[in-house]
Amino acid sequence: MQYETLNQLFFAAMETHRKPDALLVKSEGSWRPVSSQEFLEKARNLALGFHELGLKHGDRVALLSENRAEWFFIDTALQILGVVNVPIYSTLPAQQVSYIIRNSESKAVVASTASQQEKTVSIRADLSTVEHFIAIETPTPSGFEGLTLDDVTSLGTKKAESEPDLHRELASKVRPDDLATIIYTSGTTGDPKGVMLTHSNFVSNVKGTLQALPPLTTADVALSALPYAHVFERLAAHYLFPAAGITIAIAEGVDKIPENLAEIRPTVMTFAPRLYEKMHARVLENVSQASPARKRLFWWAVGVGREHGSYRLKSEAPPTFLNLKYKVATALVFKKLQQRVGGRLRFFVSGAAPLAPEIAEFFWSAGITILEGYGLTETSPVIAVNPYKGIRFGTVGQTIPEVEVKIAEDGEILTRGPNVMTGYYKNEVATREALEEDGWFHTGDVGVLSSDGYLTITDRKKDIIVTAGGKNIAPQPIENRFKANAYIAEVVLVGNQRRFASALVVPDFERLGLWAESQGLSLEDMQALVEHPKVVELLQSQVDEINADLAQFEKVKKVRLLAKEFTIDDGELTPTLKVKRNVIETRYKKLIDQMYS
């Protein structure tokens, strides 16, 4: 297929593959297929409907919605017109929604559910540029006063009867360097910045990433679960997977992933490390409850898997007897884990945050491949990914074709390529700070590049902890070690300009609860539980194990356990489940200060 714009990609993909199940959508308890033809017609009718409303090339439309099939149809319709899609996370509060709509000067707002529509009602007076409010679901709340998506579709259907080729004509006028989207970063400080990405940015990233990944075919099925407002899943599910002819099943939600994995039995899936961390924690939790004999069997299998995996990493044939042992380990232990992810998974792709190498290696030993990659919103997003034959745990792999990386004198990762954004919307100062005149983009990440091109991310440049003694500590690798522990769900390392490193730890409450019950401890008061001497002693023993492998200046000297998980709703996590470090440090300042008093 030849394509230079997202429109060319879309039409070529739909007409080349002609799938009966381009999408799979869960409805009333069963999965309903959406064919390529139905997808084409829905996108066409919406495009012409938006056109009838007066939306034209270069206008901005805000899309406030969770993942759903309509997200695909609306995004495609907007691209056909050359209209800029401004996606907004459904988890954002009304105040932040207002800022994005106002800053982008959106001409229309599409809101999915009643709760999303209510946000637009509460901020409507501030949205002077908005001419159309459009609801995906009905009934709409009081005060919404707008159209429904069905209304827009009806307008387009009528227009298609009189001008059946108009959508093709409009789509052909969109150029590769035209703006496709403005994605507002879920920044942890200040107002978010609007990242401007073109059709060419996305198309180059689709082509480069497809070359870097194992071959994908029309027989593949992907389970799609990360928010479409995030560039990682947008690139994968909306552009890359369709280009390859992959069937895309839209997960019902993050909490339904285990159930959907069993139903869909995907062959590929993209997600953030939190999924793999939780899967790993559940496995260890189940093992902890097993009989001594089952525990011995499990750890024997893991040992065999690691030895067998070391040969596979080097593309070498394992010895015959090791192969035999691995078959036994798979039959008795690993098969159950493989079945939990559907039983036919070829590989996961991990992005949006760092993945602990211990977790990637564990799944590799069990016959489940996780390809860790790296990218940012500003790079459309993929910069690098581990090759299927040549995985190196702890690295994010090698750059994809046409993308360059170099390390600046201060260790910052710089990148250049056709995937790099054109700039930040209406923010020349931030654009000049991030983009050099010769095209090099400052990622804000610190890393190391090996002689054969494997990139290792050390940390965010701004997150590096400098102790009072002048020692530099990169928190992410240490935090990843903590999160690989079965009793620890989340951790934030602190210690900037302090004498030593300390940590705020969120326990894995499910695992901790089982242990506490076995010790006769009450679970009614979580604050009392995390302060109980037995619990403190248990977690301290886990910290001591982690500290044993750290340099003296990196050792975590003090720990405080938190009584609740970090959540998106409380503003502590981004929509891709990354911790907002500054929010945590501000919220728990008294607790942090106590560790140094």
Task: Describe these PLM feature segments.
Residues 2, 22-76, 93-98, 148-156, ...:
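Conserved AMP-binding/adenylate-forming core of the ANL superfamily
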Residues 10-11, 53, 80-155, 538, ...:
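Structural core segment of the AMP-binding/adenylate-forming
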Residues 18-21, 135, 157-184, 191, ...:
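Conserved pre-ATP/AMP-binding loop-to-beta segment of ANL
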Residues 33-37, 173, 180-206:
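Conserved AMP-binding A3 loop
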Residues 115-176, 283-336:
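ANL superfamily adenylate-forming
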Residues 203-224, 228-334, 344:
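Conserved AMP-binding/adenylation subdomain of ANL enzymes
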Residues 399-467, 484:
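Conserved ATP-binding/catalytic segment of the ANL
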Residues 490, 536, 540-597:
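Conserved C-terminal "lid"/linker of ANL adenylate-forming enzymes
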